[in-house]
Amino acid sequence: MFQKTDFLSKIFSSSSHPLTGSQNIVVKDPQTLDFAMQSQNEIVCSLRERSHMNTMSYAQTQMMAIDEIRAFQSEGHLHLKYISLIIAMMAETAVVTSRSWFPYFSCPSKSQRLAEAEGRILSALGIKYLARLIQIPFKNTEISTITVNCESEQPIVKAKYPIVLIHGFGAGVALWGSAIKRLAQFQTVHAFDLPGFGRSSRPKFSSDPETAETEMIDSIEQWRDKMNLEKMNLVGHSFGGYLATSYALKYPKRVENLILADPWGFNEMDPEFAQKLTSRQKNIFWVIQQFNPLAVLRLVGGYGPSLVRRLRPDLALKYSEDVYDYIYLANSRDPTGEEVFKCLSENLGWAKQPMSKRFHELDNTVPVTFIHGERSWIDWRTTRRLFGELEHVESHIMDSAGHHVYADDADKFVQLVIGSLKDGKTGELVPEEVNLEEEIVTPI
């Protein structure tokens, strides 16, 4: 049995931090101390049961976490419930890196629950779809894919090539929601879970940023080949937009149109942002960056859906209640996709290799459309200033949307997507005056 003194005694053992001189952590609230001891004990025991982690590896993890806690701890006070969480998250990151436990998601019933939650979300929206696993050569990875065929007898404009959707960080195919239904009025739609996310396999990617990015986009190309798609109208959201752009840079002949929905990773970090940070804030941010982004969601276990509901109560307005189970279950597996994102990012989510430095290399025969949410945390103003004047680039701002443009206003989003696609017969753009709200009446 893991004893609470194994780490608490280390926290209180010395009078000051060897580097910072910070005094011992003082806890005046007995309830906070009891909570910390109990929660830390439960979390670590759970980790040990699942991972069979060796003592030395975990001891090193403890000391690293404790050192960092002391480094940014100020005025001698820090709630131990946060210490418990930090140590547990650091432990998860350490054992995932060494792959001493696998898989996170060993229970078949949970895998089935994820598939069922996905099905209920899509069915509640009246979407008829084909679900399948497409195996690609990269480490025999299986890519979870759904296809929605165009069933409209007389679509307003029939796009020449299928529409392919690439989701963002921590998401999956089901979150495209009603946008899939509307897009399928014009062309067959394929949506897939990126490797390392959703229901797809969890292959181990390289820890080198350039190699990891290449592995991810080559996986997309292998998926396209297995799907027998000559070209694609490629739509990527957030992190998916970053990967879609990277894919188009390497495989421009396979992209008919590139539509970027509030893409992540385009702008360089604002130097003024870093300059404004205090030393304490920099230390805190450094600690946070050592964790897998969604580690806390896994650490809370069965409370995951409730945590998602508390953080995003608005999701119930766009999807069925199953969305909370879906997000939790989709991110309960070995987080290899998260590790790729973590590998490609720095300084709290800025891309190490921002697309602003590479976008000029994109073949200018590939039409690009940016669709941003006015209320998004993404800096769309800089993106628009950098690329808005290029002849092959269009930029749209949805004043009714935040970061999740496809869900915040699905009708407007689809109108902009379809308006950017070339007519397969004439090569002309779909007229902007097409009113999708009036035209889309046939349920799928």
Swiss-Prot record:
GO terms for cellular component: lipid droplet; mitochondrion. Expressed in the hypodermis and intestine. Keywords: Hydrolase, Lipid degradation, Lipid droplet, Lipid metabolism. It is found in: Lipid droplet. Disruption phenotype: Increased survival of dauer larvae and reduced lipase activity in a daf-2 constitutive dauer phase mutant background. Residues 162-409 form the AB hydrolase-1 domain. Its main location: other. Gene3D superfamilies: alpha/beta hydrolase. GO terms for molecular function: carboxylic ester hydrolase activity; lysophosphatidic acid acyltransferase activity. Belongs to the peptidase S33 family. ABHD4/ABHD5 subfamily. This is Abhydrolase domain-containing protein abhd-5.2. It comes from Caenorhabditis elegans. The gene is abhd-5.2.
